[in-house]
From Swiss-Prot:
Protein function: Cleaves the N-terminal amino acid of tripeptides.
GO biological process, one term: proteolysis
Designated name of the protein: Peptidase T
Keyword Hydrolase: yes
Residue sites binding Zn(2+) 2 per the record: D143, E178, H382
Gene: pepT
Domain of life: Bacteria
Catalytic activity reported: Release of the N-terminal residue from a tripeptide
Organism: Streptococcus pyogenes serotype M12 (strain MGAS2096)
Sequence similarity: Belongs to the peptidase M20B family.
Enzyme class: hydrolase
Length: 407
């Protein structure tokens, strides 16, 4: 094993349930994230040599510093990962370690689930490698505890090898990325760097500086309930209004029909009765004009329906969540060019593609710190079929070390 503590560190982290809660109004959204930061990560950060390690209870970020040991390396680089995991069972995570994977199915614990290369052809990229999987009852949490483990391991390596020269390094572990609010209260003044990287990507080589622009859409439908036996010309069924609204959106502009640079409307929840219904959507697109056009379209649909109904029964609430960070990063591509150079020197082919999602880096970039995203190794994230390659995690550590030594 290239880095002795990497695997054990990762296993320790994923066994802690840090699932975030979209319905919470606190920061972090769950107490377990704060406990993870204070009882596990903070003591470890101090033990491996990070300085000024402190937790901010206002924004839920745990931050530490490793000062430069060569004054000629004047850049300051940050590394960021998130502590929370996605909306899937994260209680009693019991990872499996598959040494020297030789292809074929991987049975997930004693469950009836398996990782099958026919369903998940990405498994074929990992022949001969050590894979960490779930037992079929939980997610794994490689998103983003692989990133945390990689950053910690890189710092540990640097402090144990003081002859290796490096620039100033800032480390931040934050909450609630999976529910889209993790960076809302991020304090740039507490993270003085020239640029940063989120270690929150997927397979080997990912280097990303384009994200979706994102909005949340809540639509409330107000009906009028009367006895169905006497409902003619009187009842207005809120559920039918919701169906009508949904059918007016482009049917092929949904996640299951789109890829690459294509945006979408995604219905994530629908509840209600005849009297009142509520539909929740997320809206995503890469180009600013297309993003704005999607929001205008839903407003126009609501206005048209209300005009037809003769009163306001379709109420739209739109909230922007984050924006495509390409707009910021393209102004100064130093972070991207440095990462490309380091990867190529390590014989890693940079895979520069848009993220069909977002990262904390999206918001942080617009706060003034360009923050692209680098691979952390996770595959099939957010569910029971999640896995990660130990060798890919090791390569991520290599990249972190390469970045701070080349700066």
């Amino acid at each position: 094993m290239k880095y002795d503590n990497l695997l054990d560190r990762f296993i320790k982290y994923v066994k802690v349930n840090t699932r975030s809660d979209p319905d919470s109004e606190t920061t972090p959204s769950t107490e377990s994230q704060e406990a993870f930061a204070l009882t596990i990560l903070k003591p470890e950060m101090e033990a491996i040599g990070l300085q000024d390690v402190h937790y901010n209870p206002v924004n839920g970020y745990l931050i530490g510093t490793l000062p430069a040991n060569n004054p000629t390396l004047t850049r300051k680089i940050g590394f960021i990962a998130h502590m929370d995991t996605a909306d899937f069972n994260a209680e009693n995570v019991n990872p499996q370690i598959i040494d020297n994977y030789q292809g074929g199915d991987i049975t997930l614990g004693s469950s009836n689930y398996k990782l099958d290369p026919k369903a998940f052809p990405n498994l074929n990229n990992y022949i001969g490698q050590t894979l960490i999987t779930t037992d079929g009852t939980t997610l794994l949490g490689a998103d983003d505890k692989s990133g945390i483990a990689e950053i910690m391991t890189a710092i540990e390596f640097l402090t144990s090898q003081p002859q290796i020269e490096h620039c100033d390094i800032k480390v931040a572990f934050g909450p609630d990325e999976e529910i889209g609010v993790g960076a809302d209260k991020f304090e740039v003044a507490d993270f003085e760097v020239d640029f940063a990287y989120t270690m929150d990507g997927g397979p080997l080589g990912e280097l990303q500086y384009e994200t979706f622009s994102a909005a949340a859409l809540e639509v409330t439908f107000l009906g009028r309930n009367v006895h169905p036996g006497t409902a003619k010309d009187q009842m207005i069924n809120a559920l039918e209004l919701a169906i009508d609204f949904h059918e007016k959106l482009p049917a092929k502009e949904r996640p299951e029909y789109t890829d690459g640079y294509q945006g979408f409307y995604h219905l994530t929840g629908l509840t209600g009765t005849v009297e009142e219904a509520r539909a929740s959507y997320i809206i995503r697109d890469f180009e600013e004009a297309s993003f704005e056009a999607r929001k205008v379209k839903v407003e126009n649909i609501a206005q048209s329906m209300n005009a037809h109904l003769g009163t306001k029964r379709v109420l739209v609430e739109l909230n922007d969540q984050y924006y495509n960070m390409k707009k910021v990063i393209e102004k100064d591509m130093t972070a991207i060019e440095l990462a490309k150079e380091v990867m190529e020197e390590l014989a890693i082919k940079p895979v520069i593609e848009p993220i069909r999602g977002g990262t904390d880096g999206s918001k942080i970039s617009f706060m003034g710190i360009p923050t692209p995203n680098i691979f952390a190794g996770g595959e099939n994230m957010h569910g029971r079929f999640e896995f990660v390659s130990l060798q890919t995690m090791e390569r991520a550590v290599d990249v972190i070390i390469g970045l701070v030594c080349k700066a």
